[in-house]
A protein has these predicted regions:
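Glycine/small-residue-rich loop that forms an oxyanion/phosphate-binding "nest" at active or ligand-binding sites
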Residues: 66, 74-122
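Small-residue (G/A/S/T)-rich helix-start motifs and N-terminal tracts that mark the onset
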Residues: 1-78, 82-84, 89, 151-161
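Glycine-centered flexibility motif
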Residues: 68, 96, 137-140
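Conserved phosphate/ATP/ADP-binding segment of small-molecule kinases
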Residues: 101-161
Length: 161
């Protein structure tokens, strides 16, 4: 568990640096994602068109991929390649991987191809990625208990380290 002092130090660094975060997300969550980044002290940039994502990523400090934007796989690949070339961290939100084999396969491919710094998902999503199975009904599927969630997250991290 991360100590509150460590979390506060990270928060202060973000607030001082004010990183530009390139987000490829779905239209349903775009406003929430932008506002969360603004509240954390970052600058969000929502860009998903395949002709602009590489240019945007050149100027960004990080890339956040939300698999709710599954129709943007071409853009996601281009942005991720540019992020790697620039040394930018990549965060993946595996929205719906427990309910969609397309999203699950796409996310597993991302994890194999790119050095993803963080997978931000609930227990059902992480388990679906670890076991390559889908059993949940949707993105709000019941999560694991804390101990189980920690263990499956650690297993997924070891697999894709």
């Amino acid at each position: 568990m991360t100590a509150p002092a460590e979390l506060w130090a990270v928060w202060e660094r973000i607030s001082r640096r004010r990183p530009l975060v390139h987000c490829i997300t779905n239209p349903v969550t775009v406003n929430d994602c932008a506002n969360a980044l603004l509240a954390a002290g970052a600058h969000p940039f929502m860009a998903a068109h395949p002709d602009e994502v590489e240019e945007v990523q050149l100027r960004a400090d990080a890339l956040v991929i939300n698999l709710g934007a599954i129709a943007q796989l071409d853009s996601i690949g281009k942005a991720a390649r540019q992020a790697v070339a620039c040394g930018h961290p990549i965060v993946v939100d595996p929205v719906g991987v427990s309910a969609s084999s397309l999203r699950r396969r796409s996310c597993i491919a991302l994890l194999k191809e790119f050095p993803v710094a963080c997978v931000r998902g609930n227990g059902a999503e992480i388990r679906a990625l670890l076991e390559d199975t889908g059993t949940a009904a949707g993105v709000d599927a019941p999560s694991e208990d804390a101990a189980s969630a920690h263990e499956i997250a650690a297993q997924l991290a070891r697999r894709h380290d």
